[in-house]
């Protein structure tokens, strides 16, 4: 009979692969930002929340806090690096208002993590106690991470457009939450179960919204506009063009037409 630990590890490896795909799913969004040199209506909220979430889970999975959690550490360590790259790009192409907001949030997150690490290592002296404290924080901020797309979901409902809610991100979020919820239920870990269970719910809501508003999303206009065809003008040609009698005065009186003589040198 296959042991639960083996099954759990296998599910965890699959979860690592799916989570890696989740971390990479915004790449088209950031390619678009770099190409346009503008963040447009994209929000930094999900990436700021994910950054803090990754930092907390890396700390949670360390041997000094929660032993035998290497799968938690590996994927969140990778995610931490990827999110840092995303936020750097977002910062570079944001306006001053967004840059200031991001700076405040990032500084707050750094101070918060420093306080958590020092508080746990100096104030809690057993793995059980450290796991409890950090696990509660992970559950809280993991829930915030998964709920951060709610701001984008509200925008979808308001604009009836899914342009700024990538389908790939929603699909991978659903699969990721489903996998890690299963992982946590094999050997019950309530701190992993809560945020990922909610992640499944929120991702499902996004997929439903996508199905509802996909057809009402405005199509992008073709930037390659066709210019009107201009017939060649012959040498010494006179062109008669209508003129609004209320707008133009010719020789002190109103004129309905103006004759323009064009001479083309050979």
From Swiss-Prot:
The UniProt subunit note reads as follows: Forms homooligomers and/or heterooligomers.
Q: Mind telling me what this protein is named? A: Bidirectional sugar transporter SWEET7b
Q: Would you identify the family this protein belongs to, as annotated?
A: Belongs to the SWEET sugar transporter family.
Which GO terms label this protein's molecular function in UniProt?
Answer: sugar transmembrane transporter activity
Q: Which GO terms describe its cellular component?
A: plasma membrane
Residue ranges crossing the lipid bilayer per the database entry: 10-30, 46-66, 70-90, 102-122, 132-152, 166-186, 190-210
The answer on whether this UniProt entry bears the keyword Methyltransferase reads no
Q: What is the stated purpose of this protein? A: Mediates both low-affinity uptake and efflux of sugar across the plasma membrane.
Membrane association type: Multi-pass membrane protein
Q: What Pfam families does the annotation carry? A: MtN3_slv
Question: Which residue intervals define the domain MtN3/slv in the entry?
Answer: 10-97, 133-216
Q: What keywords are assigned to this protein?
A: Cell membrane, Membrane, Repeat, Sugar transport, Transmembrane, Transmembrane helix, Transport
Top-level division of the source organism's lineage: Eukaryota
């Amino acid at each position: 009979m296959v042991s639960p630990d083996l099954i759990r590890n296998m599910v965890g490896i699959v979860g690592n692969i799916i989570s890696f795909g989740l971390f990479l799913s915004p790449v088209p969004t950031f390619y678009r930002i770099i190409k346009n040199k503008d963040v447009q209506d994209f929000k930094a909220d999900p990436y700021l929340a994910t950054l803090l979430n990754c930092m907390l889970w890396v700390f949670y999975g360390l041997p000094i806090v929660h032993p035998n959690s290497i799968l938690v550490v590996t994927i969140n360590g990778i995610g931490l690096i990827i999110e840092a790259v995303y936020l750097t790009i977002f910062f570079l192409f944001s306006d001053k208002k967004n840059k200031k907001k991001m700076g405040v949030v990032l500084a707050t997150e750094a101070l918060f993590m420093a306080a958590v690490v020092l508080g746990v290592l100096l104030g809690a002296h057993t793995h059980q106690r450290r796991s409890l404290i950090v696990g509660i924080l992970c559950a809280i901020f993991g829930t915030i991470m998964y709920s951060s797309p709610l701001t984008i979901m509200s925008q979808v409902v308001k604009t009836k457009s899914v342009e700024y809610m990538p389908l790939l991100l929603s699909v991978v979020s659903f699969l990721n939450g489903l996998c890690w919820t299963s992982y946590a239920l094999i050997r019950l870990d309530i701190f992993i179960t809560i945020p990922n269970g909610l992640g499944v719910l929120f991702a499902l809501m996004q997929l439903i919204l996508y199905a509802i508003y996909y057809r009402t999303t405005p199509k992008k206009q073709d930037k390659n506009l066709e210019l009107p065809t201009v017939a060649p003008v012959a040498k010494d040609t006179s062109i008669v063009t209508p003129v609004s009698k209320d707008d133009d005065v010719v020789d002190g009186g109103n004129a309905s037409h103006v004759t323009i003589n064009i001479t083309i040198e050979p």
